[in-house]
A protein has these predicted regions:
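Histidine-centered acyl-transfer/condensation active-site motif
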Residues: 22, 159-173
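DNA breakage-rejoining catalytic core of tyrosine-based enzymes
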Residues: 1-8
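Regulatory/sensor and coupling segments of signal-transduction and defense proteins
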Residues: 11, 128, 172
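Generic structural detector for well-ordered beta-strands
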Residues: 2, 73-75, 159, 172
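Low-complexity, glycine/alanine/valine/leucine- and proline-rich hydrophobic stretches
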Residues: 139-164
């Protein structure tokens, strides 16, 4: 699903007016939808955190894996959608504070005694700065034609990204 540039900018402005991040809004709506369709009032999902730390002045020029993972939860309540987004936003701010903690350790702790079973089969991958050079604001020298991610024990990976101001949403399953 691709949003137009105007739709994306309008959405971002509305989100900004509420002092939320797009990641918090989109992930909350995603979890709310999962909870409703699975008839499960509470659930947790695996969140991909981009963790490129400025260890060297040229680190942004390095192509590589700079991710970590964490877990966020959703609990269906009678509260408003705004309250649910606020709760997700608070969780995300906490995740940023502890981003140096290896998320794989959390998954190991959760999997204790559950050999062979998927622990967090739903993933939310959010890249709202896309493949844009912050210096030139131009696309890099490559164009994505097709993409798919395949990860063991992941049933659904919800991708959200911003490509030069166009919000793009996709699912790998």
């Amino acid at each position: 699903c691709d949003f137009s540039f105007i739709e994306t900018q309008r959405l971002y402005q509305k989100i900004k007016n509420y002092h939320f991040t797009p990641a918090a809004v989109i992930s909350t709506i995603f979890m709310k939808t999962l909870a409703q369709y699975s008839e499960t009032p509470g659930l947790s999902i695996n969140v991909t955190l981009f963790n490129r730390q400025l260890l060297h002045e040229d680190v942004n020029g390095i192509l590589g894996e700079f991710t970590n993972n964490a877990v966020i939860s959703y609990q269906e309540k009678t509260d408003s959608l705004l309250d649910a987004i606020r709760a997700t936003q608070e969780q995300m701010w906490r995740l940023v504070q502890y981003r140096k903690f290896e998320g794989s350790n959390i998954l190991k702790m959760l999997s204790s005694g559950r050999a062979g079973k998927a622990i967090m089969p739903v993933v939310f991958t959010c890249m709202l700065e896309g493949n844009v050079s912050k210096v030139t604001k131009k696309r890099y020298s490559f164009k994505e034609e097709y993409a798919i991610s395949q990860t063991p024990q992941v049933v659904l990976d919800h991708h959200v990204r911003d490509d030069l101001g166009y919000l793009k949403i996709s699912w790998d399953y």
